[in-house]
């Protein structure tokens, strides 16, 4: 009798994706982050669902409904902090996943990579709208500042901002629609992740060497299922440690103050995972220029496959490219630090230099370095 998992219409899809999938025998722990992102998404959807049962998207009651969740709902505090810190874990995994793709040349799978960039935008949009929902000071002012950036768009800017606000300022209408979008987007992200996997399984996984691994494949189960479970356990360990020992470590104290349109906080800043983009935005004195730089800071990832000039796919055997890759990582960490600092000397100039270096590295330095390495190999 034929195995049911190979014949049943639904089970054979699961089988070909997670059980009998041929995988390269040498993929390292850097390939764990795809499954970790899936786990993060499931955690976020489940905790978000339970939070939505008690949350009210009204300016008068939003803040107190979050307080009610933490104080009166059974394990409400746990669900709320799992959701808030789960977002941070999501972004840590995302950045490491993208970094892995850049280092090992995974961007050469064009469709998979482009869906990934789209996913990054969708997750960032979801996280931004989620940050507005508790209706604290930083929620309100963060929403005001970021949505106001759209007014930099010529001709239609002002109308567009008022259309998004649903009025003349961030108010009840804005909060209600942000809640609606924040609820629906994770399901769209889940669907996109399915498409991401579909395209990936058309080509098969890349591997650290960047070479074709068709001659040496192993089944996904049990080898990589066990490996992924180890990653998931470590992720849950870090997340629960964060939630149970210092749940507010990555949050902003200002968000424990009810939103007040008449009182601007001294330093408006987003969550830590947006700080690098926020630093790039702030480093350009012109409003429209800043908005373009902000969008390009993520959109530049879509250009990476077209800037690949090396004869080798992976950076594994390219020491000079490796060097510039780690400079790029250091530059992003610098931008993250600058994004959390006040707009004053010397932070302004450091932010401007780090922003220029970010675009220079991706668009100019790394492609030229790859050409230089080709010559070293007499190719």
Curated annotation (Swiss-Prot):
Amino acids binding heme b b562: 83, 182
UniProt keyword annotations, A-Z: Electron transport, Heme, Iron, Membrane, Metal-binding, Mitochondrion, Mitochondrion inner membrane, Respiratory chain, Transmembrane, Transmembrane helix, Transport, Ubiquinone
The keyword Transport is assigned to this record: yes
Record's keyword annotation contains Ribonucleoprotein: no
GO biological process, one term: mitochondrial electron transport, ubiquinol to cytochrome c
Matching CDD domains: cytochrome_b_C (cd00290), Cytochrome_b_N (cd00284)
Transmembrane segments: 33-53, 77-98, 113-133, 178-198, 226-246, 288-308, 320-340, 347-367
GO cellular component annotations of the record: mitochondrial inner membrane; respiratory chain complex III
Cofactor binding, per record: Binds 2 heme b groups non-covalently.
Cofactors named for this entry: heme b
InterPro entries: Cyt_b/b6_C (IPR005798), Cyt_b/b6_C_sf (IPR036150), Cyt_b/b6_N (IPR005797), Cytb/b6-like_sf (IPR027387), Cytochrome_b (IPR030689), Cytochrome_b_C_euk/bac (IPR048260), Cytochrome_b_N_euk/bac (IPR048259), Di-haem_cyt_TM (IPR016174)
Chief location category: mitochondrion
Residues binding heme b b566, per UniProt: 97, 196
Pfam families linked to this entry: Cytochrom_B_C (PF00032), Cytochrome_B (PF00033)
Lipid bilayer topology: Multi-pass membrane protein
GO function terms (MF aspect): metal ion binding; ubiquinol-cytochrome-c reductase activity
Subunit architecture: The cytochrome bc1 complex contains 11 subunits: 3 respiratory subunits (MT-CYB, CYC1 and UQCRFS1), 2 core proteins (UQCRC1 and UQCRC2) and 6 low-molecular weight proteins (UQCRH/QCR6, UQCRB/QCR7, UQCRQ/QCR8, UQCR10/QCR9, UQCR11/QCR10 and a cleavage product of UQCRFS1). This cytochrome bc1 complex then forms a dimer.
Similarity field: Belongs to the cytochrome b family.
Function per UniProt: Component of the ubiquinol-cytochrome c reductase complex (complex III or cytochrome b-c1 complex) that is part of the mitochondrial respiratory chain. The b-c1 complex mediates electron transfer from ubiquinol to cytochrome c. Contributes to the generation of a proton gradient across the mitochondrial membrane that is then used for ATP synthesis.
PANTHER family: CYTOCHROME B
Protein name per Swiss-Prot or TrEMBL: Cytochrome b
Biological source species: Sorex isodon
């Amino acid at each position: 009798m034929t195995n049911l998992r190979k014949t049943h219409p639904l089970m054979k899809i699961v089988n070909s994706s997670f059980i009998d999938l041929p995988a390269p025998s040498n993929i390292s722990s850097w390939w764990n982050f795809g499954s970790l992102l899936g786990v993060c998404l499931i955690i976020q959807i489940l905790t978000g669902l339970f939070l939505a049962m008690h949350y009210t998207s009204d300016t008068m009651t939003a803040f107190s409904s979050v307080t009610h969740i933490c104080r009166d709902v059974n394990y409400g505090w746990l669900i709320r902090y799992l959701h808030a810190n789960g977002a941070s874990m999501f972004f840590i995994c995302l950045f490491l996943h993208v970094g892995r793709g850049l280092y090992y040349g995974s961007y050469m799978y064009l469709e998979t990579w482009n869906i990934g960039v789209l996913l990054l935008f969708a997750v960032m949009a979801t996280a931004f709208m989620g940050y507005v929902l508790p209706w604290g000071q930083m929620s309100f002012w963060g929403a005001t500042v970021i949505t106001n950036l759209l007014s930099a768009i010529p001709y239609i800017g002002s109308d567009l901002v008022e259309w998004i606000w649903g009025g003349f300022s961030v108010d009840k209408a804005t909060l209600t629609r942000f809640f609606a979008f924040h609820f629906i987007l994770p399901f769209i992200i889940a669907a996109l992740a399915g498409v991401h996997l579909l395209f990936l399984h058309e080509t098969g996984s890349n591997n650290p060497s960047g070479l074709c691994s068709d001659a040496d494949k192993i089944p996904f189960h049990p080898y990589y299922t066990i490996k992924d479970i180890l990653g998931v356990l470590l992720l849950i360990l870090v997340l629960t440690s964060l939630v149970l020992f210092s749940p507010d470590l990555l949050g902003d104290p200002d968000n424990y103050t009810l939103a007040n349109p008449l009182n601007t906080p001294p330093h408006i800043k987003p969550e830590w995972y947006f700080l690098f983009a926020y630093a790039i935005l702030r480093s350009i004195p012109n409003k429209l220029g800043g908005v373009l730089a902000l969008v390009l800071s993520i959109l530049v990832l879509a250009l990476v496959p077209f800037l690949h000039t090396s004869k080798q796919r992976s950076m594994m055997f390219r020491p000079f490219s490796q060097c510039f890759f780690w400079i790029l990582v250091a530059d992003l960490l610098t931008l993250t630090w600058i994004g959390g600092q006040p707009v004053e000397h010397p932070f302004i100039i450091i932010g401007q230099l780090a922003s220029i270096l970010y675009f220079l590295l991706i668009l100019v330095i790394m492609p030229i370095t790859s050409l230089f390495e080709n010559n070293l190999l007499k190719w």
